[in-house]
């Protein structure tokens, strides 16, 4: 068994991300692990998990756009903006599909919004969702999100089924709330599925896919570096003359590193001596 892994797992609905992580730790027999982006308990879909030293790659992985499919239930009200805390259901008249399509199209772009109270945001060191469950009153700071694309898949009143690709920091539950408010009603998400984080994905039938991290790092690979293998393994200073400044991946026989080259040819180790999963040696 490898000491490090990067996997895309398909989280079932009504299971917390932490509970899913615990199952995966047991499945792979590894104790050190973390996930890239939290999925709401009621949601299903892609949960990217790193084991061992691969958790160090999280800040560097290409994880946007994030793609989701969601169903908005018009007329339903919930403090959590999903079906877990339904407070009331109102029967509302049907809308023209073209009006819904116009609203969805108007959301494309970047804007500030207030994230939902039932979220993983921190308030004085505590998770917002814990405070919300206790009935505590608090205000979350506005954050920014970008909607790159949003498409109406179907409208069967009172359910609006749509697909959306977004930036980090976006809550699809809030997108559902915004759509409902523009229609003049309450609304909650009755289903939510994360399709992908960047290019990292897995299907419901596949369940678990082992990923090659080299395919999901946004940096170019620096070639002809084998003569520096021992020096870089030991983390020694080296100078790379005539190299363009920037961040690079350097691959050796038994490990790879992420470095930054400066204009004077000096380098900084961003991440050094990251081991391969045997299957992925020399695949990039």
UniProtKB/Swiss-Prot annotation:
GO-annotated molecular function: RNA binding; tRNA pseudouridine(55) synthase activity
Annotated catalytic residues: 40 (nucleophile)
Enzyme class: isomerase
EC number(s) given by UniProt: 5.4.99.25
Keyword line: Isomerase, tRNA processing
Catalytic activity of the protein: uridine(55) in tRNA = pseudouridine(55) in tRNA
Xref: Pfam families: TruB_N
GO-annotated biological processes: mRNA pseudouridine synthesis; tRNA pseudouridine synthesis
Family label: Belongs to the pseudouridine synthase TruB family. Type 1 subfamily.
Function: Responsible for synthesis of pseudouridine from uracil-55 in the psi GC loop of transfer RNAs.
Protein name, per record: tRNA pseudouridine synthase B
